[in-house]
């Protein structure tokens, strides 16, 4: 005669099956938690990259030798800029990168040889020290100097003065504060030039 418990699992088998079920449940819980954490971290990284520290790629040579075609840089959104800051700004659905030369209300004068003078009044302009330039040039210029920068705007120029189209030309003009994306602070690519942007 058959025992009525012959087809039933033993208590050890039940315990092993219970442990396997618990393990699968814990594994799914850890996996779900990890995926949620990764999604949250990715979302925060995207928000920071978009709102606080945009990552930009440089196209063209208007900022050489400081920045060259293909460089990847980090910028910081801020509202205060100084003369000498390298900034990114919106222009015709593109982002351009140039250097701040003069601030709102300041006067700018550029000689035919490319020497740049900046001052609070047209009578007290000083020669701008520009160690980042390889060569000076008047470049593509169709405004009359001396020139006073309008309020809420900055006067910008590229470091490769002979090829850069910038505030010296009415096509770009002075950049409004609301057009500014941010100050470029760090180059992340190429790795050979990894570091702060001066």
Where are these regions (language model features)?
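Soluble "head" domains of membrane/secretory-pathway proteins
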Residues: 2-30, 51, 57, 65, ...
């Amino acid at each position: 005669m058959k025992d009525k418990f012959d087809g039933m699992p033993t208590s050890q088998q039940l315990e092993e099956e219970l442990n396997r079920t618990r393990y699968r449940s814990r594994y799914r819980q850890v996996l779900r938690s990890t995926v949620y954490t990764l999604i949250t971290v990715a979302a925060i990284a995207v928000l920071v990259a978009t709102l606080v520290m945009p990552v930009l790629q440089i196209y063209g040579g208007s900022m050489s030798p400081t920045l060259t075609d293909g460089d990847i840089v980090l910028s910081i959104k801020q509202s205060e800029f100084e003369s000498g800051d390298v900034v990114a700004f919106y222009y015709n659905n593109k982002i351009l990168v140039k250097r701040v030369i003069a601030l709102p209300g300041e006067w700018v004068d550029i000689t035919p040889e490319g020497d740049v003078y900046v001052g609070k009044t047209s009578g007290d302009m000083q020669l701008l020290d520009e160690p980042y330039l390889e060569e000076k040039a008047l470049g593509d210029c169709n405004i009359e100097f001396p020139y006073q920068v309008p309020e809420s705007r900055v006067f910008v120029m590229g470091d490769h003065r002979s090829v850069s189209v910038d505030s010296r030309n009415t096509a770009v003009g002075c950049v409004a504060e609301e057009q500014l994306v941010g100050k470029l602070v760090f180059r992340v690519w190429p790795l050979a030039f990894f570091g702060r942007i001066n």
